[in-house]
Amino acid sequence: AKMTAGRIVQKLCDDYVVNLSADTIEDCVEAGKELFSEYKPRDWDDDKDASQLDICQMSFTDVLKNALEGLNEAQNKLRINKLTGEEDLMFQVPGLELEYNGRPDFSGQIELKTTWASVANTKSGKRSSSIPTQPTWSHLCQVAGYWAMKRKPQAIVYANENNFRVFTEENCEKLSAEALQNIWNHMVTKCRIRENLLKSADTIQDLLGLVEPDFSHMWAWDIHPDALNEAKKLWRFV
């Protein structure tokens, strides 16, 4: 539900500031309600996803407003005249055989990240989300890829129901050109290793024998139990 909520907020931001197809915030909110109604909660987690959906629906209006404020601040900081929406980037990287793919959210320079309260065994039934004091590693890796192609300054906007925070190279050293180059070098090395693994394996089973799965990862294996069991069989864990 959280991932869907994030996509909905991004689409509503697109409608309001990029496509100009929504005249008011209220129009966006009504469109958001319609989009949420189309989501079908997963049916294998004891209704946790359904409860999470309720939480996201109750707070998405505030998250949207904070996201829009954050985007406006980021646009001004990066001196972008007019925002464009998400684009699909494919580019060749020296030393790699496969093209690199990325999808920046706005103008190839701004990445929007929403954080949502979670289902919890508390009186309110939820646990509030927080905005990071520094960008997370995975988000830095994302924008490093966009920087590598565009060679333009990057911003990361975090928004929740209470506030927003904008990171640029002005207040975050990790978004400087030098830091992004170092992160990009790290990513290219990892991509090269993965390409070598793919080339060295003749079959899927050969490839699985070269990669150690982390089934204890906090979210990577948060999938349907049948699919998880099938994966464990492929790796011969069961």
Annotate each language-model stretch with its function.
Residues 13-21, 114-117, 148-151:
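Hydrophobic/aromatic-lined pockets within catalytic cores
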Residues 89-142:
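Non-catalytic protein-protein interaction segments used by genome-maintenance enzymes to assemble
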Residues 1-103:
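Metal-dependent nuclease catalytic cores that hydrolyze phosphodiester bonds in DNA/RNA
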Residues 9, 137-150:
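An active-site-proximal "capping" alpha-helix that borders the catalytic cofactor pocket
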Residues 2, 132-136, 173, 177-180:
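Flexible, glycine- and charge-enriched loops at secondary-structure boundaries
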Residues 84, 108-112, 154-158:
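A structural signal for short, well-ordered beta-strand segments and their strand-loop junctions
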Residues 147-238:
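Metal-dependent nuclease catalytic regions and adjoining charged, substrate-binding loops involved
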